[in-house]
Amino acid sequence: MAEKQLRILVTGAGRGIGRSIVDQLKKNPLQHKIAVTARTESELTAAVAGATGETLVIPADATDSAVPQKIIDTVISQWGGIDAIFLNAGEAQVLPIELTTDDVWNHILNLNTTAPMRFLRSATPQMKEQKFGRVIVIASIAGLMGEGFVTAYTASKHAVIGLVRSAAVELQKYGITVNALCPGYVDTPMLTKGLEVSAQRTGKTIDELREVLAAKQPGGRLLTADEVAEAALSFIDSDGTGQALWLDAATKKFY
């Protein structure tokens, strides 16, 4: 990982992959400065507990159009800049396409695609000025392939990969990299929530559905949030940009 202390923002930091990213950052001997944001303050407070470096807890709703700018401004005001952002906040709703209302569609696209764009847009001027930045988006294998009953989620992840690729081309000359990580099925609270809905639709148990998803992956199992976090953190040291890299559950390597 980086050889100097960094000022890092993690969105969706209260649980799942975001929480695991924070947990691994806390272990780094460089004592990175860690800002965390999500809706629930108690989850954020728990996430940064035990950190030896400086932390900022910023409870907020990323779907509010004004929030990303306010969060970036807070981090810069507190620490004089921002070096890396892990854009992890996201949501899926399991619905057949005929029941995917405009409200559902707009909410998912807002959180999964528009909010990352707003965070990136807000951080870009500071990163350009300091000629360094790392932006890592936790996308999904659903951004590289189709998946039934999660139309809005799949569309949002395809779109955010387009955002990553375009921004990477534009910002590379400023020392800013923008990359997406596309893990397969990850054992997180969001996955469990989706399986609960699928169980009602299919009549299968949650355990049976977990086995179905695990069988789709090269390793025959679900990824863990820690595995995804470890892969995401590797982007900090890389000069590569514009990538949408698939992480599988067999070798834990990129494709």
Where are these regions (language model features)?
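Short C-terminal tail/terminal secondary-structure segment
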Residues: M145, D237-Y255
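Residue(s) in the substrate-gating loop at a strand-loop-helix junction
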Residues: S140
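Active-site helix of classical SDR
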Residues: L120, S156, V164
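Alpha-helical segment proximal to the catalytic Tyr-Lys
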Residues: P125, V169-K173
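Conserved glycine-rich Rossmann-like NAD(P)H-binding loop of the short-chain dehydrogenase/reductase
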Residues: K26-A46
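Conserved glycine-rich cofactor-binding loop
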Residues: G14-R15
